[in-house]
Amino acid sequence: MIKRNANGTWTAHNVPIGTNPAYAQALVDYFNALDPLFAKAQEKSDFEFICTLINVQGMQDAGWDAFETTQDIFETFSRLKSKVRYNTEQLHLFLVLYGLILEASYPYDLLCNLLRVISGDRYSAFCFPDIKMGKNGKSRSMFASEKLNKIKELAKEQGLEKNIEPLVRIFDKELRNAIFHSDYCLYDDEIRIPSPTRIYKTADVMNLINKTLAYHEVMVRLVKMYKATYEKPEIIDVHPDFSNDPDEKVVVMVRKGTGAIGIKDNWTQEEIAHGKIPFRLCRLLPYEQKMLQKDPLLADFPENKVDKFNKILRHFPEPVKKRLLPVFERML
């Protein structure tokens, strides 16, 4: 439906009948706004760009990628929509989904780090440090609105304000707060917020929600698309501030059908034995970790077996799933 031409411009083709117009137009607008951020960051530094895509967060095993859960919730709500019979019930679902998309941490981290990398700065696992509260030593996490303000500042410094417009356009602080505090009312064709007093037309909110769904879809697809640009393990330069060793290079770790899943040192076993320091920055599945333990030089992994098995299990009822799961786990 949405394709990028040779000039890098995204356009819509053969839009399915029944597609919401606001959603379809937002897809085009948001791809054209956000794609250049990915392209500029990749051009600046493959090393820092890959760290940004895989969202390096230090030492973690499987099961700590919150954005995977966000995508699962998105897909679950999409399936639920077809089972809900009444418009008000669908609206409640969409309002919650709107709030969840606005609160998801990774898209904020992603945009912040893309802007950092473009500026020549480095990837940071802590783009949004906690804010200290008074003299008692306590602190709190940044609110989503505060994260947005920081992203706007970074974009302004580089003349890229237009590229973050997708997030700015969909962000309604009062509506978000009302949803998560259960402080809104559906009445006739309106959504009402008692405090602060606001009245939205339901049609306007649905237009906003469709744009928000498009924003989420674009972010997910761009991450997948740019990961897939790394089809085979390749040797790349590190950031100048990463290592003092002039010979330091890294290898891009890839998974068939996914693309980049991390980076690792490019030292041979002999070089490591003579004092070179090995390292890995990656997100691996449990069975891939075992593969890497057996072969520390491994950088080219087969397709995701877990996804493959999950697609099969999805078609079975829970009792059958529980019996099949141990069988599949032994096959990994």
Residue ranges of predicted features:
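Flexible secondary-structure boundary motifs
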Residues: 97-169
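Histidine-centered, metal-coordinating catalytic motifs and their short helical/loop contexts
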Residues: 164-193
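Extended intrinsically disordered or low-complexity regions, especially N/C-terminal cytosolic tails and loops
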Residues: 1-97, 236-332
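Short, charged/polar micro-motifs that form catalytic or ligand-binding hotspots
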Residues: 86-104, 162-170, 198, 202-205, ...
